A protein has these predicted regions:
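Conserved N-terminal beta1-alpha1 strand-loop-helix module at the mouth
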Residues: 1-86, 139-141, 145-148
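Short, surface-exposed connector motifs at secondary-structure boundaries
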Residues: 29-37, 123-125, 150-155, 177-181
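Catalytic cores of alpha/beta
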Residues: 51, 72-83, 134-145, 168-175, ...
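Short beta-strand/loop segments at the ligand-binding rim of alpha/beta enzyme cores
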Residues: 56-66, 120-132, 176-186
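Glycine-rich phosphate-binding active-site loops on the catalytic face of alpha/beta enzymes
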Residues: 63-68, 86-101, 148-163, 185-195, ...
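Conserved anion-binding
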Residues: 76, 81, 91-151
Length: 221
């Protein structure tokens, strides 16, 4: 039970589907409180609703910006950030501009992240690199840029692309960053075995929409 609680405290309980209903969001919030997940991660439109439910529970409120493509203006991402903070978000998962990164416009990527970090005023910033679209060398470069730009986490994927997390990807990221940087594994994580394996090789946080199933598996073992 104790180990299960420790693992629950590393999970961002997530529902980012465009067709998510209010009833589903309410259940997500209730489950997060029950299992003591680290946070709930929802689209910005749900922040106020979720915040009212989880207030005082110890569950953090996470949202996404520039999601899921990352291909919006920095000014748009900053606007989304400000509105998300206004509505209670304490953790922000932002998508980097994948196309610019592929074109090796690393300075633009870095400057955007720095602006987001500065405007976040100490709130947790996780930068999504969409590992399924990157080769090993690109994952290494992206990881270093994100750390140097002051973000708190490198996040593997949106869950809306062609690949999620793997232990191999976590190892690549881990070998590219210092011990001060953290990693969030996300995308296709649906079993307790996956969670345990990802944590073992260096993931600090898990993003999953199957968190309740994962916890039930852990508690049954």
């Amino acid at each position: 039970m104790k180990d299960s609680l420790l693992i629950a405290g590393k999970i961002d309980h997530t529902l980012l589907r465009s067709d998510a209903s209010m009833e589903e969001i309410k259940q997500l919030s209730t489950d997060a409180i029950h299992y003591k997940f680290h946070s709930i991660c929802v689209n910005p439109i749900w922040l106020t609703y979720v915040n009212d439910i989880i207030k005082g529970s110890g569950v953090n409120l996470c949202t996404v910006i520039g999601f899921p493509l990352g291909a919006s203006f920095t000014s748009n991402k900053l606007f989304e950030l400000d509105k998300s903070i206004e509505h209670g978000a304490s953790e922000i998962d932002m998508v980097m501009n994948i196309g610019f990164f592929k074109d090796k416009k690393y300075n633009i990527i870095s400057e955007e992240i720095k602006k987001i970090v500065q405007s976040a005023n100490g709130r947790i910033i996780k930068v999504i690199i969409e590992t399924g679209l990157l080769v090993k060398e690109e994952i290494e470069i992206a990881s270093r840029i994100i750390e140097e730009s002051g973000a708190n986490f490198i996040k593997t994927s949106t869950g809306f692309s062609n690949f999620g997390s793997s232990t191999e990807i976590i190892k690549i990221i881990k070998s590219s960053i210092s011990s001060n940087m953290q990693i969030k594994a996300s995308g296709g994580i649906s079993t307790s075995k996956q969670v345990l394996n990802l944590l073992e090789v260096g993931a600090d946080r898990i993003g999953s929409s199957a968190s309740v199933i994962i916890m039930k598996e852990l508690l049954d073992n």
